[in-house]
Swiss-Prot record:
Organism encoding this protein: Methanosarcina acetivorans (strain ATCC 35395 / DSM 2834 / JCM 12185 / C2A)
Protein name: UPF0228 protein MA_4223
InterPro entries: UPF0228
Family: Belongs to the UPF0228 family.
Length: 178
């Protein structure tokens, strides 16, 4: 092998090594936590997920207990400002969907008499979200992109696309692993 060939081989090996190191340094996520509207069936969840380009196999833990139970109310856009003025108002997360807002309430606020009175006063119905955990691959370590996790940028793209679906309330990325 001549000197130029050796240099080319070493250069290619170095580039391959650097590419592999860069890939392993990228931020990855092993799953998504998705909250769907009340009464969204498991079949609907499967159908919704099939419409999105998820680059790996995944399993669905339907109605998962992995996250705290979340409740929500739907409030017309024109009523949200009035509701915020109420002294018993407690909002964890507010999400704008079309011409209404989704107000997420954690389980701890649901039995609160003041919150229930405020809901009744404003003629609002409390609903329980359907929580699903989407696990990429088989969930085993080590985390290998394309097998049991996806890159954070792909997870964010999927999250943003899913949140445009009417049945999807909120999407969270699972613990990011590096």
């Amino acid at each position: 092998m001549n000197k130029i060939s050796k240099v080319v081989v070493v250069f290619i090996a170095l580039l391959t090594f650097l590419a592999l190191m860069m890939q392993s340094q990228e931020v990855k996520t092993p799953g998504l936590l998705i909250q769907f509207e009340n009464e969204t069936s498991e079949a609907e969840v499967k159908a919704i997920l099939e419409n999105y380009d998820i680059p790996v196999n995944y399993t669905i833990d339907y109605n998962s207990n992995i996250g705290r139970g979340m409740y929500y109310i739907e409030v017309d856009e024109d009523k949200i400002y009035e509701l915020r003025k109420d002294e018993n108002w407690t909002s964890v997360v507010e999400i704008k969907k079309g011409n209404y807002n989704i107000i997420m309430l954690s389980e701890e606020f649901v039995p609160d008499e003041n919150v229930l009175a405020m809901l009744e006063k404003n003629n609002l119905q409390l609903k329980k979200a359907v929580v699903c955990y989407i696990q990429f691959g088989d969930g085993s370590a080590p985390w290998v992109v394309g097998e049991n996790c996806i890159l954070e940028r792909d997870a964010i793209r999927i999250k943003n696309e899913l949140e445009t679906n009417e049945k999807v309330l909120i999407v969270g990325l699972d613990d990011i692993v590096g």
